[in-house]
Amino acid sequence: MLDFMDNVQHAFYEASHWNVDNSYGALNATARALLDFDSPRGLRLQISSLAAPNFATSYTLGSVGVVDGSVSYLYSSLPLRKDFKSSRIDLHHVIRGFKHLQELRKPDEKWSWEQWHAGRRVDRKDTLLYGRIFLPQSRLEALYLRRLAPTRQLRIAAVSDSNLNNGGTILTLLQTDSGKYSTEYMYSTDSALMGLRGLYNFGPDPRVAPTEPTRPEQVEPVHGRFSAGAELYYGILNKSGGMSTGLRFTTLPNHPGFPYTMTLTLNPLMGNLSSTYAVKAGPSLALCSRFDFNFYSYESELQLGCELWRRRGNTDTEWAVKKLRPDWKRPAASPDDDVAGVLKAKVDQDGRVGLLWEGRIKELLFTLGASLDLKKREQIFRSVGIELQYSS
């Protein structure tokens, strides 16, 4: 489940019209959500608040052997009007799961960002600042986001920790998204790492208006999207590099059948080949599989996962109301009013099992999880934990 600050950052992307899914780093987002989720350990409590449309705070307290915690602050120059209260927030916005990719949208025109007053430009570029300190480790994380243009964004992330080389590291990303394609230029102070990533979407260009067909029957709707991408990076100090490439096909909302996503990624230097397949088998069920193979060592690994959304049943009195008023429909207080939670499960070929139950109780968001190892009969449970979130 997304924590409060991650959800606020996603709201900033949404308000500034930035598509986080149109990048090479998000190529396997669905498989990671269904197969790479972490089970909580111990007890963790988070209390957060959006004190103003531009300012948010969050406090976290945990107990895993020792008591630890963190304090977070976030500032956004762009007012965020979204409802972040844990009692009313849509669970689909905070629970990672099967991703339905939407149609590519045309980027905003540059002139639409301009604001003039008395013959002078007074507009400012949208900016987000975020800081988090971990106690008692005294580890500090910071994030700087700035929208440079409708198709360009600068992201600078920094970590200060005495356990890291040189006491910390800084990662800089210059991201460009034109709809049809996206690029990322990366530099990290760790080993002076430089990199480049790109993603290209085949099919119609959202920047070009479609031409009117001579006959209506000539219109062929696009039901899926095929994407190809690659990344290349090189460390100047350690004189080592790497690369990977990937393919993805996913259905779009107008697809008449079951939504599904297929990906294939290859790291030729390490010899790793990975393929994933995820399908939305029903309104409340999603299935996913991943097969990894190394053609240098001939080792392979298979993982299976699923998510099952639990929906509330009809109330005991609803049938009686419908008898009296056949046209009555139960009003929904929120988009996920009928959703009680989601159950996630994953298993690999070595007998390692992960279970996760996420949902809402009254005004609290909760995550209850366990990690098991079926091959160790004397100690099957590897970890058990629960996380509670409250936001106002």
From Swiss-Prot:
UniProtKB keywords: Membrane, Mitochondrion, Mitochondrion outer membrane, Transmembrane, Transmembrane beta strand
Secretion signal, residue range per the UniProt entry: none
A matching Pfam family: MDM10
GO biological process: establishment of mitochondrion localization; mitochondrial genome maintenance; mitochondrial outer membrane translocase complex assembly; mitochondrion-endoplasmic reticulum membrane tethering; phospholipid transport; protein insertion into mitochondrial outer membrane
Membrane topology classification: Multi-pass membrane protein
Keyword Transmembrane in record: yes
Principal location: mitochondrion
Superkingdom field: Eukaryota
Family: Belongs to the MDM10 family.
HAMAP family for this protein: Mdm10
Comment, domains: Lacks alpha-helical transmembrane segments, suggesting that it resides in the membrane via beta-sheet conformations similar to those predicted for other outer membrane proteins and porin.
Subunit relationships: Component of the ER-mitochondria encounter structure (ERMES) or MDM complex, composed of MMM1, MDM10, MDM12 and MDM34. Associates with the mitochondrial outer membrane sorting assembly machinery SAM(core) complex.
Protein name per its UniProtKB record: Mitochondrial distribution and morphology protein 10
Organism annotation: Phaeosphaeria nodorum (strain SN15 / ATCC MYA-4574 / FGSC 10173) (Glume blotch fungus)
Gene that produces this protein: MDM10
